[in-house]
Amino acid sequence: MDELVKRHGSTHFANINYGYYILFLSIIYIILLFCLRNYAKITTRSTRFFKKLYSLNPFIHLSILLIAIFIPFYQPHLNKLTVYYKRLGRLSYTLIPLNLFLTLKPNWFLPSQCTYTDFIPIHKWLSRFITFIAILHSILFLSHWSSSSDENVSIAIKLQNPKNVLGLIMLIPSLLLICLSIGPFRRFSYTSFYIIHNISNVMLIFLTPIHARPGVAIPYLIINSILLLAIAFNKIFFIKKSELLAKETLPNYDNNSSLVTIRLPRSALPETFTPACHIRISPYQFFNPLYWLLPSHPYTVVSLPSDDSVDLVLTENIKKFAFRLHMERSYTIINQFNPSVPIACLNSSKRVCIVCGGTGISFGLPLYRYFSEIIERNQRSIEYLRLIWMVKDKSQIKILEKLNSLKYDLEDKNFTSNFHVFITQYSSKSSGIEDSSGSGYELEDLTPEDPSSIGPYIFGSVNFGRRIEWTTDLSTFVEHDNDIDNTWMLACGPSTLVESANKYADKSGVRFASEIYTL
C-alpha cells in the first residue's frame, strides 16, 4: 500500500469519497421519488414544472441529477487530469445501482405509486449517460497514454497490465451499444440491441471491480449484485406457464404486419388485477439461458378480472425472424404490471376521455369497460365517459368481434353509445357515403357495399376520412366550473397521437396519463 501511495501520491484515493457521494445522492433521489409519488398531489393549479417533475420527465429529472453530480466533480486542489479521467470511470460505476433500481419490475419500493413504464425514459437516458462517460473514461486514458512524453507511459506498456486490458475489452460492447441504441438501429433489430445491452451491463458490473483501482467491490458490487438478484427473483417467482387458447389474425394491417387477437386461459393472471395492466411473454422457460439473454415481449391485457379468459390485441411483424405467438406452444407469462394510469384516476375521476390509436385499443377498452361498469352499478358518479379509437382502415374494426371479453358488451347500446370510431384512410367519395359524425349510426348501414367487413354494431359515431379535431369533437368534455381536478384525458398509441392528446390536455387544464406503443 505504501508503494502504491508513493507512486500515485495522495491522488490515488482522491475519488473514493466522490463515489460515496454519488451513492448517497442516488439514495436521496430514491427517497425523494418515494415522497413525490406518495405525498405530492397534482392538481390543475400545479405548475408545469411540477407536473413534469411528478410525471418523471427525463429531461427534468436528469438535469437535477447531473447538476448534483457535477457540482463537486471539479476540485481545485486536484490538478492532475488523470484524477478526473479516473473520476469519470468511478462515476459510471457508482451510478449503476440507481440505474438497476429503475429497472425493477415491479419496483418493490414504489409498488403502487409508479409502474416500470414510468421509469423507462429516465432509465434509457441514464443508461446512455453511464455508457458515454465510461467510453469517455477509456478514450481519455488511451489518448493520455499515446501522447505522454514519459518513456514509461505508452499504450503498449499500459496494456501489459491485465487490468487495463479488461478496460479495453469493456470498451468494445459499450461502443457497439451506443450505436445500436440510436432509434433506427434499435427499431430495425431490437433483439440485437437487447443482447448487446445485457452483455455490456454484465461486463460493466462484474469486470469493473477487477479493473478499477482503488477497488469498487465494496459496497458497489455488493449492491449491484443484490439488485440483480432482485431482478432475477421477479423473473423466476412471478411467472406462470401457459398455452394459447385461441389466435385469430386480421391480415394486411399494414405493409409489414398483421393485427392479431390472442386468448389465454384466465389462470394466466391472478384473481385480481388493474384494468389495462401489462404482461410480458417469453417463449422460453426460466432455466433456458435464452430466457435471460433475449427480450420478453410486453402486451396490454384487454380483459377485466371478471372475464373468463385473458384477451390480447397486438401486431405481428410478417418478417421471417420476427417474434410471433403460436398455438400448441408453451409460453412463460411474466408477472402482471400496473398501467401508467394513476390510482387517483381509477378511484375518483368524474369525467374521462380515452383516446387510442391502432393497437392502443388494448389500453382503451379495459379502462372504458371499467368505468362503464362503475356507471352501470352506480358505484360512483361519472358525468362524462368517451372512448375514441382511430384506425387506418374500416376492416380493422372486425378485431372487436374476435375478443371473447367483448362478446356481450358490443351488443349493449349503452356500452357502444360512447364509443366513437375514426377511420382515417377511408374515402367517402369512392363509396358515396357521407361522414357520419352524428350519433347512433349502425355500421352495416354505413357500408352497404360490404356489411360484413365491419360488423352490425352501433357506435356513438363513425367518422370517415379524418382524425380527431380535439376542440370540436371534445367540445363538451371540459367543464372548468365542475371539478376539473377529476377530469382525465387518457391516451395510448403512436407518439404523435399521445403528444397531441397531451397538448390538448395541457391547454385545457385537465389531468393526463398515457402510454406510447413504440420501441
From Swiss-Prot:
GO function terms (MF aspect): ferric-chelate reductase activity; superoxide-generating NAD(P)H oxidase activity
UniProt entry keywords in alphabetical sequence: Electron transport, FAD, Flavoprotein, Ion transport, Membrane, NADP, Oxidoreductase, Transmembrane, Transmembrane helix, Transport
Stretches assigned to the FAD-binding FR-type domain: 237-366
Superkingdom to which the source organism belongs: Eukaryota
EC number: 1.16.1.-
Cellular localisation: Membrane
EC category: oxidoreductase
Record-linked CDD domains: NOX_Duox_like_FAD_NADP (cd06186)
Spans traversing the lipid bilayer: 16-36, 53-73, 91-111, 129-149, 165-185, 192-212, 214-234
UniProt record, GO biological process: apoptotic process; reductive iron assimilation; regulation of actin cytoskeleton organization
GO cellular component: perinuclear endoplasmic reticulum; plasma membrane
Domain Ferric oxidoreductase: 88-207
Membrane topology, from the record: Multi-pass membrane protein
Function: Probable cell surface metalloreductase. May be involved in iron or copper homeostasis.
Protein family (similarity comment): Belongs to the ferric reductase (FRE) family. AIM14 subfamily.
Protein name: Probable metalloreductase AIM14
Gene of this entry: AIM14
